[in-house]
Amino acid sequence: MIRVHSLDLKGLRCWQKLHWEPGPDINLLIGGNGVGKTSLLEAIHLALGLRPLLGFRLDPLIPEGSEHGFLSAVVESHNERREISVGFAKGKRRVRVNDKRLRQPDQLLQQQAVVPFVPSDLHLVQGGPQARRKLLDQTAFYKHREHAENLRRYNQALAARNALLRSRKSDPNLLDVWSRELARYGASIQQIRSHCSEEFH
């Protein structure tokens, strides 16, 4: 479990400046449209997940007339407290943890899992299985370090095998190699997805 002890914002969407100390339990954000409730959640997600809550681009977070934004959060997980600061400008992001620049974000993401659920995620229930697999993969990234590499290698093998099948002169031996790679990494991916699915229940 992750606890956010404090959050400081400077230039994030509608917030020019804010200091917030959430309570230790459930926090309710109440207010009219456009007052900044979602922006607060987006700031927390950016601090923990290192990317925006809605989409992937950082530019929309910067208020009109500004060139950059900044947030700082003091969080605690696994009995370890750390300060995470994120500075962002047009197309750029700089992350520091305990005042040291973070060069490998994956190291931090493994320690603080955050999986959001927003109204636009209703397609998880109403849509096809692809969206649900994506959610399982997002969850798995935090708990199983090998999952991202398994997915990368699976997609690589799939692309190579499909290209081989489309070619007029396909090598049966090479086709067998890629098929075995698909089976190998596909089995690992399915096992991890099943494990994460059981945890959701």
Please annotate each region the language model reported.
Residues M1-L46:
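Pre-Walker A-like glycine/lysine-rich segment at the N-terminus of P-loop NTPase domains
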Residues P24, V35, S39, F56, ...:
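Generic alpha-helix structural propensity
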Residues H123-H201:
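An accessory alpha-helical subdomain
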Residues K37, E42, L58, L136-D137, ...:
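Alpha-helical structural signal
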Residues H19, G65, L151:
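Short, flexible helix/strand-to-coil boundary loops that buttress conserved ligand/catalytic motifs
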Residues L48-A131, D137-H147, E198:
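Nucleotide-state sensing region of NTPase/ATPase domains
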